[in-house]
Amino acid sequence: MSKRDFYEVLGVSRDASERDIKKAYKRLAMKFHPDRNQGDESAADKFKEVKEAYEILTDPQKKAAYDQYGHAAFEQGGGGFGGGFGGGGADFGDIFGDVFGDIFGGGRRGGGHARPQRGADLRYNMELSLEEAVRGVSKEIEVPTLVHCDTCEGTGAKKGTSAETCGTCHGHGQVQMRQGFFAVQQTCPTCHGKGKIIKDPCNVCHGQGRKQKTKTLNVKIPAGVDTGDRIRLSGEGEAGERGAPAGDLYVQVHVREHHIFEREGNNLYCEVPVSFAMAALGGEVEVPTLDGRVNLKVPSETQTGRMFRMRGKGVKGVRGGAIGDLIVKLVVETPVNLSSRQKELLKEFEESCCGEAATKHKPKSEGFFNGVKKFFDDLTS
């Protein structure tokens, strides 16, 4: 099945800004998140598709390659983005780990078949409010996992006994099969590649060396994390086979949409409504910040959509550095539910701005309509 265009997946145009791409990603990631659509394979597939598109289109080099060559740029080993959890975001090991690739579902890495396998890595999806993500927070979580059996101490053998070396493969976990002139290595059919045989298995774990348990963990989320960041808890994954090391637990962060602020990098954005009179005459308006309310001075003759930067009122990144800014967009609010007297006053005001005064009081409108008139005059001349 051919892949959909990444821009189509996110519902953005090809000239969309990084901010628009991130905004689309956050909206779709929340919609198709596995925690909100448990058991829905279609939603899980869409979540992976959205994440893959986001990872490509927010990386300048990958985006340039995709724009030029499409999906072909990442075929034949060109990135491995199909795994769904590779790339993107930041990892923080041991609580701030290294960037990892397609770890989930793997967990069995390194060594020969006869050696006990390291435990599988686990993933936990954690949803945070913007305030929690910005300030940092400690969260208690419950994780169903496999732990070493206390009764047999992870060996799988009944207490007082031990596993014996497999007589078929002599502990190698593999046997050599001859086919004509060729010798082929195959997994030992007796011990199934483990190299050991448990003749008297543990009554509790039935020879597995592990048992199911729900662990309660306290996770410290560092200040400044954002959607896509991952936190590694070393050794908190599934227990390994027959006493082998445990895997890791990766906590994947998703920040909920905020009703006031929108985050882009370390900057915050918000819209603040102002009255028509304040926009024209100037004044002060109260602006919300993560630290409380502050007053913003509004110059006279402010047009709707004008941006104001409040330095140091944004987010301090998880890796340190300067604190971001709060970008405030002023939106001039049209008055509604007017009384008769108010309507009369507005009509008087509008009439006072017409005629020769229009150029002075409404330069943009006057310039626009003069341009429209000239356009049609040129068409008919």
Swiss-Prot record:
Q: Which residues form the J domain?
A: 5-70
Note the PROSITE patterns from the entry: DNAJ_1 (PS00636), DNAJ_2 (PS50076), ZF_CR (PS51188)
Q: Which SUPFAM superfamilies match?
A: Chaperone J-domain (SSF46565), DnaJ/Hsp40 cysteine-rich domain (SSF57938), HSP40/DnaJ peptide-binding domain (SSF49493)
Chain ranges of zinc fingers (CR-type): 136-214
Q: Where are the CXXCXGXG motif repeats?
A: 149-156, 166-173, 188-195, 202-209
- InterPro entries cross-referenced by the UniProt entry: DnaJ, DnaJ_C, DnaJ_domain, DnaJ_domain_CS, HSP40/DnaJ_pept-bd, HSP_DnaJ_Cys-rich_dom, HSP_DnaJ_Cys-rich_dom_sf, J_dom_sf
Protein location = Cytoplasm
Q: CDD domains recorded for this chain?
A: DnaJ, DnaJ_C, DnaJ_zf
Matching Pfam families: DnaJ (PF00226), DnaJ_C (PF01556), DnaJ_CXXCXGXG (PF00684)
Indicate the segments annotated as coiled coil, or none if absent: none
Q: Which GO terms describe its molecular function?
A: ATP binding; heat shock protein binding; unfolded protein binding; zinc ion binding
Q: Where is the signal peptide?
A: none
- The positions annotated for binding Zn(2+) 2 are C166, C169, C188, C191
Q: Which SMART domains match?
A: DnaJ (SM00271)
Q: Which UniProt keywords apply?
A: Chaperone, Cytoplasm, DNA replication, Metal-binding, Repeat, Stress response, Zinc, Zinc-finger
Primary localization: cytoplasm
List the record's Gene Ontology CC terms alphabetically.
cytoplasm
Which family does the UniProt entry place this protein in? Belongs to the DnaJ family.
Quaternary arrangement and interactors, per the entry?
A: Homodimer.
- Know anything about its domains from the record? The J domain is necessary and sufficient to stimulate DnaK ATPase activity. Zinc center 1 plays an important role in the autonomous, DnaK-independent chaperone activity of DnaJ. Zinc center 2 is essential for interaction with DnaK and for DnaJ activity.
Q: Can you name this protein?
A: Chaperone protein DnaJ
Organism equals Vibrio vulnificus (strain YJ016)
Give the gene name.
dnaJ
